[in-house]
């Protein structure tokens, strides 16, 4: 079934209903006996009996509605009924079709033109027309001129909760709101992060951006400041340690300069020694230099002083290779080896025979060998045999 009703069908239904209402409203009222007390709308009975009301009648329901009606009293718009009939003006005629509005118990009144005195039949027809127009206006929704303004609350609900707006019916007017107490939804005390909201089709579009991130709370800021203070103190301690090492670095530099000076002095002294003693020529082995310093025959030819050889024997001898050489030098006699004191060694070996040799026969043999030994090698052989026998 189609849920949408066309505007033409709606107009036909309203027209049929208004024709029925005009038929019953056009009939003259015979008296108060034709209406019971339960069927009369409050505020309309004096009009029906010929005593119109002079003031607006209000029926406050609760204290809350009464407070609202004070601030919204300007929302009840009177209706001016024009007529060609003459009479006494200034009479207020209440609207019987819409006597109660449902907001604060306000009775809507109809003000007549001051120069016109309405009659029963004319009043019924005019009120029926006005009721028809109001009923049509109720079925046809007018476009909104502005979006509903919601009260801004710091730390209110999130974006999902903000999207659900409760619209209350009321009169056209502004009133003071007592507000509501709710727990803050944000610990930082700022507006929570909200996504980009799409413009509504039935309202005036406006450029809306993304709300900024939530502000950092005071506790978080203090924690950050304390952390930065601790890091700064730690950094200051490190800087103090670095400055304390500065004196040591200066001392190391001075010692390094002293070492460089000493090294330069040593290099200068070595250069001086090289100048005084150039050393071996490059590429000449030491053996060849030593052979050049050995004795060899020197032949002197021509006139000269021969006194250096006059005292020597002028005889030449031939060596094993038949080479003429002067008198051969006598062979070197080997130096006699100094006689070592063997008495101490013999005492030591005698003690070893007594302690290490258990066999009496072996002891006797070692003692005889020790008595005959006269050299160091013989004593070493005896000592070696004693150690082997003991093992």
Curated annotation (Swiss-Prot):
It comes from the Viruses. InterPro entries: P/V_Pprotein_paramyxoviral. It holds the Pfam family Paramyx_P_V_C. Residues 55-65 have a biased composition (Polar residues). Residues 343-391 are annotated as: Interaction with the nucleoprotein. The keyword Coiled coil applies. Residues 218-245 form a coiled coil. Residues 216-279 are annotated as: Multimerization. Keywords: Coiled coil, Phosphoprotein, Viral RNA replication. The modification Phosphoserine is found at residues 69, 188, 257, 292, 294, 301, 374. Residues 55-90, 145-208 are annotated as: Disordered. The modification Phosphothreonine is found at residues 10, 16, 39, 91, 150, 165, 250, 258, 282, 298, 375. The keyword Coiled coil applies. Essential cofactor of the RNA polymerase L that plays a central role in the transcription and replication by forming the polymerase complex with RNA polymerase L and recruiting L to the genomic N-RNA template for RNA synthesis. Also plays a central role in the encapsidation of nascent RNA chains by forming the encapsidation complex with the nucleocapsid protein N (N-P complex). Acts as a chaperone for newly synthesized free N protein, so-called N0, allowing encapsidation of nascent RNA chains during replication. Homotetramer. Interacts (via multimerization domain) with polymerase L; this interaction forms the polymerase L-P complex. Interacts (via N-terminus) with N0 (via Ncore); this interaction allows P to chaperon N0 to avoid N polymerization before encapsidation. Interacts (via C-terminus) with N-RNA template; this interaction positions the polymerase on the template for both transcription and replication. Interacts with host RPS6KB1 kinase; this interaction may play a role in the viral replication and transcription. Belongs to the rubulavirus/avulavirus P protein family. The N-terminus consists of a long intrinsically disordered tail. The central part contains the coiled-coil multimerization domain (MD or OD). Forms a four-stranded coiled coil structure. The C-terminus constitutes the alpha-helical X domain (XD) that binds to the nucleocapsid (N-RNA complex) and the L polymerase. This is Phosphoprotein. It comes from Mumps virus genotype B (strain Miyahara vaccine). The lineage of its organism: Viruses, Riboviria, Orthornavirae, Negarnaviricota, Haploviricotina. The gene is P/V/I.
């Amino acid at each position: 079934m189609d849920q949408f009703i066309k505007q033409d069908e709606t107009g036909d239904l309203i027209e049929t209903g208004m024709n029925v209402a005009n038929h019953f409203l056009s009939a003259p009222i015979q008296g108060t006996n034709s209406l019971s007390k339960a069927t009369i709308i409050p505020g309309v009975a004096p009009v029906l009996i010929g005593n119109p009301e002079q003031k607006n009648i209000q029926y406050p329901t609760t204290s809350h509605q009464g407070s609202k009606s004070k601030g919204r009293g300007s929302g009840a718009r009177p209706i001016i009924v024009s007529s060609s009939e003459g009479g006494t003006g200034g009479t207020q005629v209440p609207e019987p079709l819409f006597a109660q509005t449902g907001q604060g118990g306000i009775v809507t009144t109809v003000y007549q033109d001051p120069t016109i005195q309405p009659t029963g039949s004319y009043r019924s027809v005019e009120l029926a027309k006005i009721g028809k127009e109001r009923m049509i206006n109720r079925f046809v929704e007018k476009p909104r001129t502005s979006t509903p303004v919601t009260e801004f609350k710091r730390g209110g609900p999130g974006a999902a909760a903000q999207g659900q707006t409760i619209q209350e019916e009321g009169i056209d007017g502004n009133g003071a709101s007592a507000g509501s107490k709710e727990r803050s939804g944000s610990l930082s005390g700022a507006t929570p992060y909200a996504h980009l909201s799409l413009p509504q089709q039935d309202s005036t579009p406006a450029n809306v951006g993304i709300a900024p991130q939530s502000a950092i709370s005071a506790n978080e800021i203090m924690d950050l400041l304390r952390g930065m203070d601790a890091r700064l103190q730690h950094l200051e301690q490190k800087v103090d340690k670095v400055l304390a090492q500065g004196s040591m670095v200066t001392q190391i530099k001075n010692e390094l300069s002293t070492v460089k000076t000493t090294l330069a002095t040593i290099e200068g002294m070595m250069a001086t020694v090289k100048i005084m003693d150039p050393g071996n020529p490059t590429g000449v082995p030491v053996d060849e230099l030593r052979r050049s310093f050995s004795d060899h025959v020197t032949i002197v030819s021509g006139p000269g002083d021969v006194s250096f050889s006059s005292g020597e024997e002028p005889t030449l001898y031939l060596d094993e290779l038949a080479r003429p050489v002067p008198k051969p030098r006598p062979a070197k006699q080997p130096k006699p080896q100094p006689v070592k004191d063997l008495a101490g060694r013999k005492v030591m070996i005698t003690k070893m025979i007594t302690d290490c040799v258990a066999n009496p026969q072996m002891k006797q043999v070692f003692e005889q060998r020790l008595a005959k030994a006269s050299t160091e090698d013989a004593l070493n052989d005896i000592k070696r045999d004693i150690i082997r026998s003991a093992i």
